[in-house]
């Protein structure tokens, strides 16, 4: 097997490696739902490598247009990688907890997926982070924000309410917001609830969400917030999920800057 590999040319080895990455990505895409975004990126990278192979093939045959296209593709990739680096840096820098002791006027917990009536892994981590924070801040109102999507028997807000009440949080503090279907709506409708409660949204509020999601939530809120990050467990698989989510969030941040939502 090793002799056959050595007998291959560099171009043949690259094609073989690209085919291997393609197959591995297809397996991840099919059998590991949590890593689908990273698998899609790998598939895209494989496609780009194949395009490079074709352009190089035609460029060596004297097609000048292929050579120019190859240079243009390199320039686009360098620009895209530079933009990704900037966005990813923002996501990472915005993922840390707020260390200030300044009091907050309210807490907003952002929802995530619900499987039937059971919180997803991401939502469980947000509930855990919220429960710990509310124990330390027992006198502030809490808005639980999240509507109902496909496959969800109850709203995300109701799922969070049930879980927090089971953990001993006073139900009278909890104000479900059950209309939202996006982060932007989460914050818009939560702001309206705070105003109804007589809480000035311009005052400092705490926002509980996943660590990778904090940067975008902070930008969308626009005011002074106490960031309360929810983290996935430290096991290797969950850390792979974390990397996947942080990479995906850079694209979500790009969409926010382009579309404003």
Residue ranges and their predicted role:
Residues 63-64, 211:
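Alpha-helix N-cap/helix-start capping motif
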Residues 85-247:
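A structural signal for short, hydrophobic/glycine-enriched beta-strand patches
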Residues 1-7:
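Short, Lys/Arg-rich, polar N-terminal cytosolic tail immediately upstream
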Residues 11-58:
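Membrane-embedded alpha-helical segments of integral membrane proteins
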Residues 3, 56-63:
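Cytoplasmic membrane-interface regions of multi-pass membrane proteins
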